[in-house]
Structures are given as structure tokens and as C-alpha cells.
Amino acid sequence: MGRVVLVTGVAATLGARAARRLVDDPGIERVVGVDVLPPRDDLGDVRFVRADIRNPVIAKVLAVEDVDTVVHMSVVAGAGRAGGLAAVKETNVIGTMQLLAACQRSSTVGNLVLKSSTAVYGASAHDPGLFVEDMPPRQLPLSGYAKDSAEVESYVRGFARRRPDVAVTVLRWADVLGAGIDSHDSQLGQYFRLPLVPTVLGFDPRLQLLHPDDGLAAVHQAVVVMRPGTYNVAGPGVLTLSQILRRLGRATVPVPVQGVGTVGQALRRASDLELSSDQVALLTHGRVVDTTALRDRFGYEPRWSTAATLEDFAEATGRGPLDARRIRSVEQRLVAAYAAARGPRGGTHDA
């Protein structure tokens, strides 16, 4: 009898692609895709079950489908079709708790794969040059996706202690960048699409990127090879933010660090971008991780470097100076939103 894999988060592009990749594997008998909303992408032969992982009904899905492997892809960075940031927080944290509770009671689940994020390391002025998997963050993430990811990983570690018979693999993805990736899966991609990009004055952070093909290949390998552990997943090489923006041909507006919070509020009014505190920290201090364990212990070497990932993104989304009228329009909206965020007397101040 072949493997039966359940994939969460298939309404988003990355979850759908993960499920389609797995269903094409001849060693896997069936793939079940779960989400609270119907998928926009074609799932092919994946069996879709509309279910909310925040609801205990997910335990019934595991039992009825006789699932032996769970791939948790629905921890996301930003608001999607399902609602605002409160709904994202609930899905990320409460949804994971319910899913793990269902896995703990299951007699068939023997493999759990979590798509996590290098955001768990945070970003601060005191960070090491490279984060390895067993390093704690120098400054704990206080909000947003980074905090959610850290909480989710803590619940997964607790599950692993209670169910030592289950192989648990945590894949900490660097910031994924690719054409067609949902904004709540790639806040950095949404940021790089801005025609006028705000940067933190006086800082030029080092960044790593991950091509979605490499991230999904690592997920696939975690399902079929089962080498439990925690692994950083990132493309080789590093680029500074200024190098990235030059290669994309984006216009920039440097902002003093004291005004970044207000600019974040302005961006929420002028565009769909949610510039959270963890994103601001990343765009100030950067983050670089070591991928030796991924290569030597897990047995996977990313095929796309950070530079090649950026090049692929640029080719797909366009590069070079954007239309001047569009830049002026965004600039005017940003200035107006900035003024509104500050209030009539500049009453909104950053701490």
C-alpha cells in the first residue's frame, strides 16, 4: 500500500504546488489537500477537502483518509483571502495546535513536515554573521510572522517529545521570491514590486533568497526520504538590499529609522503591503543562515543561488525604471497617507 499525504494550505500557490509535486510521485498513492477556501490553482489529481484546521474536524480527515504523512504549509506571513491579520494569527497558531492535536491522536501518522521560516531567528544589530539551526535568536521576535513561526516551532517540538515515534522535519525557508507567489507567502516579493521602495536610512542589510522550486524540492525530499531534524533552506550567496534594488531598477526613498513605523502605516493605506515590525527589522539588519546541515545531513543542495533567484524574479516581473507617472502617483499617495498617519499635529510618533 502506498503513502497517503495530507498537505495544508493548498488554497495558496505554494501549498498547491507542493501537493501537485507530491501527487506526481509514483511512490505516493494519494495526496489530500486541505484548506478553508477552494484553491485558485489547478490541483490535478490531488483530492481537495474543504476544512478549517482550526476546527477539531481535521482529526476526522486524518482518520477517514488514512493519512501517514502531514505536510503543514499553511503558516503564512500576511493576510490572504481568508481575512485580516487576526485570522492569519489564528490560522498560524491555533490552526497548528489543532492539527498537532489531531496528529497526536492519530494511529497512522508517522511523518510530519513543517514549512517554517528563518524569520524565527529575528533580526537585530547583535546577530552573528551566520545563523545555524541550534542558535537562539539574539532578540526574540515580538510580533507578526516571525513570532507566529517561533510559536509554531515550539508546539512542534512539544509534539515531537510526546510522539517520538513520528519523524518530524522542520524546514526553515529563507524569504521565498518567485513570480506568481501569493503576497502572504512572500512579503519581500510584494515589497520589491513597489514602484517606489522605502529603505532604512544608513542601513544596507544582507539578504538571502529562496527560489520556490528549491523550497518545494526540499519539502518533497522530507516526505519521501524522511531525515528528521531542523534545516535552514536558502539559496547560496548573499546580496545587499541596495544590490537587489539596483538590479531590479527600483526607485528608492531612504527613511530615517525613527520614521519607519509611520511609513509602515502609510504603506498600508497606499498599497496592500503590510510592513510589519519583523519585516522592518529584516530590512534594517538583514539575516544570513548557514545551510551546511541541509547539504550534508539532509542531502539536498539548492539549485538556485540568491542571485539567480533574483534574476528569475526580475525576468518574470519586469525590471528597470518604471513609468514616471506611476512613481509620482504612488509618491503622492504615500505622502498623503504619511500625513494622515501622523495626525494633524504629528501626534503619532515612533518610540
Predicted regions mapped to residue ranges:
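N-terminal Rossmann NAD(P)H-binding glycine-rich loop of SDR-like oxidoreductase domains
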Residues: V5-G27
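Glycine-rich Rossmann NAD(P)(H)-binding loop
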Residues: T8, V176-G178, V200-P205, Y231-L239, ...
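NAD(P)H-binding glycine-rich loop region in Rossmannoid oxidoreductase-like domains
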Residues: A51-I94
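Conserved Rossmann-fold NAD(P)-dependent oxidoreductase catalytic core, especially the SDR/UDP-sugar
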Residues: M97-G144
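Active-site Tyr-X1-5-Lys
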Residues: P141-T169
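Substrate-positioning beta->alpha
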Residues: E151, D182-S186, V200-V224, G229
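NAD(P)-dependent short-chain dehydrogenase/reductase
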Residues: F159-L207
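Mid/C-terminal beta-alpha module of Rossmann-like enzyme folds, strongest
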Residues: G215-S277, T291, E311-F313, G320-Q332, ...
